[in-house]
Amino acid sequence: MEALAMGSRALRLWLVAPGGGIKWRFIATSSASQLSPTELTEMRNDLFNKEKARQLSLTPRTEKIEVKHVGKTDPGTVFVMNKNISTPYSCAMHLSEWYCRKSILALVDGQPWDMYKPLTKSCEIKFLTFKDCDPGEVNKAYWRSCAMMMGCVIERAFKDEYMVNLVRAPEVPVISGAFCYDVVLDSKLDEWMPTKENLRSFTKDAHALIYKDLPFETLEVEAKVALEIFQHSKYKVDFIEEKASQNPERIVKLHRIGDFIDVSEGPLIPRTSICFQYEVSAVHNLQPTQPSLIRRFQGVSLPVHLRAHFTIWDKLLERSRKMVTEDQSKATEECTST
């Protein structure tokens, strides 16, 4: 009975006992299939924290950089900041409370940049908001962030006896009507179809993340580090290899909210509390191109800066339930840009 109680987290070895008999001994193992979701989370965060500390230790001496603000208000303001430590949010704090509350992304030398991502050199900076004439980059960041939050919710929504494998969050435009996350659930759940109560439960968990006001941390790592962090996820390993192959340095971007870590190109929004109306609205089965059934979870959200009347929200919610495909999304985006 003791052996059964130890279940799949132990390996049974036989040893020759004194006198020629055989005795059994159980030793703990650390193979992928034998780690619980809690243990996986702890392992990933340990590796993330170690890499973050290692990168910080590479610049023990504080170096100063000059950051010039080129926005419409207060143009030409120059901040003297700390290299690899100060972030766009640090600069916003020197401007005003308005910039801290309204800024969703920064443009650093023209490149979209997370608000909490450290600045690496002297540069020009501009802050982006939802109310800009062209909020395209902000909208993309918001959709990515909402998808990552949904991934966090789905990974933790099922009991430990069911394996949940996050595949990826497809990059779909806001105009598609819903953000998405592709997931492979335990084969024991192949016949499961979510009820309205299930969707409400997912939504409730998402609002718990919003209420916690968690920051989106960002960390750029070598592919080998990302592969170690996600060594137990076949789909993430494949995704990491794909992303690493797209740049000669084989750098992969990771993001974290709370203790949930994911692979995301970014940039993402600063904090979960920027979301206001948020709902996990649908789950669709994708065409079976792989041995395992892939589910596409979908949701819709509006930020606190763009709240909608409930009648408009209901229309957005209804639209978000229609299955989003990447081909349709690309076609829609091309039509709107011409």
UniProtKB/Swiss-Prot annotation:
Quaternary organization: Component of the mitochondrial large ribosomal subunit (mt-LSU). Mature mammalian 55S mitochondrial ribosomes consist of a small (28S) and a large (39S) subunit. The 28S small subunit contains a 12S ribosomal RNA (12S mt-rRNA) and 30 different proteins. The 39S large subunit contains a 16S rRNA (16S mt-rRNA), a copy of mitochondrial valine transfer RNA (mt-tRNA(Val)), which plays an integral structural role, and 52 different proteins.
Keywords for the protein's UniProt record, in alphabetical order: Acetylation, Leigh syndrome, Mitochondrion, Primary mitochondrial disease, Ribonucleoprotein, Ribosomal protein
Sequence positions bearing N6-acetyllysine: K126
Phenotype upon changing G299V: In COXPD59; uncertain significance
GO CC annotations on file: mitochondrial inner membrane; mitochondrial large ribosomal subunit; mitochondrial ribosome; mitochondrion
Name of this protein: Large ribosomal subunit protein mL39
CDD domains xrefs: TGS (cd01616)
Gene Ontology biological process: mitochondrial translation
Gene from which this protein is expressed: MRPL39
Tissue localization of expression: Isoform 1 is ubiquitously expressed. Isoform 2 is heart-specific.
Subcellular location: Mitochondrion
GO MF annotation terms: nucleotide binding; RNA binding
Chief location bin: mitochondrion
The organism of origin for this protein: Homo sapiens (Human)
Domain TGS per the UniProt entry, residue ranges: 63-129
Domain of life per record: Eukaryota
Record disease entry: Combined oxidative phosphorylation deficiency 59: An autosomal recessive mitochondrial disease presenting with multisystem manifestations of variable severity. The disease spectrum ranges from lethal infantile Leigh syndrome to a milder disorder characterized by hypertrophic cardiomyopathy, lactic acidosis, attention deficit-hyperactivity disorder, and survival into adulthood.
Family: Belongs to the mitochondrion-specific ribosomal protein mL39 family.
InterPro entries to which the protein is assigned, alphabetical: Beta-grasp_dom_sf, Pro-tRNA_synthetase, TGS, TGS-like, Thr/Ala-tRNA-synth_IIc_edit
Gene3D superfamilies: 3.10.20.30, Threonyl-trna Synthetase, Chain A, domain 2
